[in-house]
Amino acid sequence: MPIRGYIIEKYNAMTNAYTCNRLVQEASALDMDLQIVGIHDTMVSPHGVINHGKILEPVDFVINRYKWGREKDAINALATRSYNPLTAYNIYINKFEQVRRLHSEAFLIPKYLLGTSLLPFSSIVEQLGLPFVGKGLESSMGEEIVCIRDKASYEELSLNYPSSKEWLFEEFISESYGRDLRFYSIRGEAVACMQRRSQGDFRANVALGASVEPYPVTPGIRTIAADIYEQTGLDFLGIDLLFGREK
């Protein structure tokens, strides 16, 4: 019987998602049965986890590629093994937990605050300077990443989002405006790295139009990969690094 698994994603049909479809293709070449399970095509009932009208069966493994909610947790319960392990995954999808827990001699953490948009503007500026960056705790692909340049742009957070929403406020690293590094790590080994560059946006997300170019996997990057794996136990991950004055 072939090894069976689920990729947890947004939809069953991830037509334009290269990574998901490539994983399915490679699994098939290895005689593995890998199915994309979309959260928005799934519901959890007392009878089981139902996807497109069918109860999902237990499988050998799941690949977690969706961050939010509890449906993904129910799908993970059907598997013998989760990549990444669910407990660690649920912790480290949160940007605050990342800056609070992760450390290495090979990188620095920007100054940060956790709070809502009801914090006095002056108190944040006093701690972080101006401009500063506001980040949604579980956002991705550049969404909910805002550069706060003045009080008016800070007040837009309260206008555009619930006042109860927590934000990670970070100091603005000007040396990294419109550029950063993204490297990929598999069980503590850095396997690839790229530099992302944006024209006219402080964010360097490919989803927002940034260009990419190869970047060498340096000894420092290898150290970061090993340190983060030791601290998290995450099997695979993409790690973003800013350029700074010192590191």
At which residue positions do the language-model features occur?
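Active-site nucleotide/adenylate-binding loops and adjacent lid/helix of ATP-dependent enzymes
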Residues: 2-9, 56, 79-80, 87-178, ...
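Conserved N-proximal alpha/beta basic substrate-recognition cap immediately N-terminal to
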Residues: 10-114
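A generic structural signal for well-ordered alpha-helical segments
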Residues: 27, 75-76, 102, 125, ...
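Short glycine-enriched loops at secondary-structure junctions
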Residues: 67-69, 88-89, 189-190, 196, ...
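Generic beta-strand structural signal
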Residues: 114, 185-186, 243
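Phosphate-binding site of ATP-dependent enzymes
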Residues: 143-231
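Conserved metal-phosphate-binding beta-hairpin within the catalytic cores
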Residues: 228-247
